[in-house]
Structure formats: structure tokens, C-alpha cells
Amino acid sequence: MNSLSIFFIVVATAAVCLLFIQGYSIYENYGNIKEFNATHAAFEYSKSIGGTPALDRRVQDVNDTISDVKQKWRCVVYPGNGFVSASIFGFQAEVGPNNTRSIRKFNTMQQCIDFTFSDVININIYNPCVVPNINNAECQFLKSVL
């Protein structure tokens, strides 16, 4: 055996030993690893320091492709009338006769969440902040929740 063969055998042996040590370390600390993951699971899909948004691809919803916070849909308490789904684009809308739109209101927060983040694509949006209604109460409310 020449010195080059011995060198590669030593490197390969060291690499295999490191793999075994890492495996044993994971085996010994598996309980701690599970506890750490459970504690920090809420931060798993948060925006990283590097600036790239991390997406939770397990569940598809309307906010997955949006990075601007004001554009993200959210359920908020509407004064005196339950809950509404809002973003910078406006409110989720109910379409009435003659294609008139009004704010879709929900009795509970869970109903609002279920409707807003369901698999159904809802393109009915009512934006009260377009001309000529810029100063109405609905527009002021929309601006206040964003």
C-alpha cells in the first residue's frame, strides 16, 4: 500500500466515524429535538432574516403568494355587525341584484376564517375607497384596519 491509499482509507474511516457520532448524538437527544421542534413550530414558516418569505405548502390559502402585509386577507371585527374579511383590495363582497356589491358580514370569526381561507376562489371584492366614495365610513374603516 502506498501513502495515497492509506490517506484515503484514513479519510473514509474518519467520515464514517463522524456519521456514526452524528447518528448517535441524534439518538441520544431525540427527546430534546422533539421538544425544541414543538416549541418553535409556530415560527417554522415565518419570514426569515434573509428576506425570503417561507411558505407553508401543506395548506393552500389566499395569502400564500402575497408578501405585502397590507395585501394579505384577514378577518376583523366590523363595528356592530360581526366580522368581515379585509385587505388593501377591499372587503369580500356579496353580489346583489343588478350586480350591486356590499360587504359580506359573518356572525362569528370562525365563519369568516372558513370563508376567507377556503379552497373556493372568491373574486367578489367590494372596495369602498374608489372614487367617488373615498371619504365614506366604510373606506375609513378599511384604512383603519390596514
Curated annotation (Swiss-Prot):
<keyword id="KW-1160">Virus entry into host cell</keyword>
<keyword id="KW-1015">Disulfide bond</keyword>
<protein>
    <recommendedName>
        <fullName>Envelope protein OPG155</fullName>
    </recommendedName>
</protein>
<keyword id="KW-0261">Viral envelope protein</keyword>
<keyword id="KW-1162">Viral penetration into host cytoplasm</keyword>
<dbReference type="GO" id="GO:0046718">
    <property type="term" value="P:symbiont entry into host cell"/>
</dbReference>
<comment type="similarity">
    <text>Belongs to the orthopoxvirus OPG155 protein family.</text>
</comment>
<keyword id="KW-0472">Membrane</keyword>
<dbReference type="GO" id="GO:0055036">
    <property type="term" value="C:virion membrane"/>
</dbReference>
<keyword id="KW-0597">Phosphoprotein</keyword>
<keyword id="KW-1133">Transmembrane helix</keyword>
<dbReference type="GO" id="GO:0016020">
    <property type="term" value="C:membrane"/>
</dbReference>
<dbReference type="GO" id="GO:0039663">
    <property type="term" value="P:membrane fusion involved in viral entry into host cell"/>
</dbReference>
<keyword id="KW-1168">Fusion of virus membrane with host membrane</keyword>
<keyword id="KW-0735">Signal-anchor</keyword>
<comment type="subunit">
    <text>Part of a stable entry-fusion complex (EFC) which is at least composed of proteins OPG143, OPG147, OPG155, OPG086, OPG094, OPG107, OPG104, and OPG099. Formation of the viral membrane is necessary for the assembly of the complex. Interacts directly with protein OPG107.</text>
</comment>
<feature type="topological domain" description="Virion surface">
    <location>
        <begin position="22"/>
        <end position="146"/>
    </location>
</feature>
<dbReference type="InterPro" id="IPR007664">
    <property type="entry name" value="Poxvirus_A28"/>
</dbReference>
<dbReference type="GO" id="GO:0019031">
    <property type="term" value="C:viral envelope"/>
</dbReference>
<keyword id="KW-0946">Virion</keyword>
<comment type="function">
    <text>Envelope protein required for virus entry into host cell and for cell-cell fusion (syncytium formation).</text>
</comment>
<dbReference type="Pfam" id="PF04584">
    <property type="entry name" value="Pox_A28"/>
</dbReference>
<keyword id="KW-0426">Late protein</keyword>
<keyword id="KW-0812">Transmembrane</keyword>
<feature type="transmembrane region" description="Helical; Signal-anchor for type III membrane protein">
    <location>
        <begin position="1"/>
        <end position="21"/>
    </location>
</feature>
